[in-house]
Regions:
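A short, Lys/Arg-rich alpha-helix, primarily the initiator
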Residues: 2-26
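Residue-level signal for the short linker/turn that defines the boundary of a DNA-recognition helix
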Residues: 18, 28-29, 55-58
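Short, charged recognition helix plus adjacent turn
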Residues: 74-86
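Short alpha-helical DNA-recognition segment
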Residues: 28-46
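The alpha-helix within a helix-turn-helix
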Residues: 24, 35, 64
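Short, basic-rich loop-to-helix N-cap that marks the start of a DNA-contacting helix
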Residues: 52-65
Length: 86
């Protein structure tokens, strides 16, 4: 499959990044403040907010934790209607 994501996944990454950005702004936090809490570079936080797919998931989790949104990760595949139907 290579490093290029299907367009649909790229769009979803951008939506996730935008949601993280909005959560940061609602909390009146700067990119630098999040980067300091997460112990990563401000550039990495910026990449997350832009939906760049090369950022490791552990960094996403640390950003969610810094925003007190880490429990939201538990919502992934929670219902899994298709899997339950199999």
């Amino acid at each position: 499959m290579g490093t290029k994501l299907p367009r649909k996944l790229e769009q979803k990454m951008q939506v996730v990044g935008e949601q993280i950005r909005l959560a940061r702004l609602r909390r009146n936090l700067s990119i630098a403040q999040i980067a300091e809490r997460v112990t990563c570079s401000p550039l990495t936080v910026s990449r997350i907010e832009k939906g760049v797919p090369t950022v490791a998931i552990c960094i996403y989790l640390r950003v969610l934790y810094a925003l007190q949104l880490d429990d939201d990760i538990l919502l992934l595949a929670k219902e899994d209607a298709m899997g339950k139907a199999l």
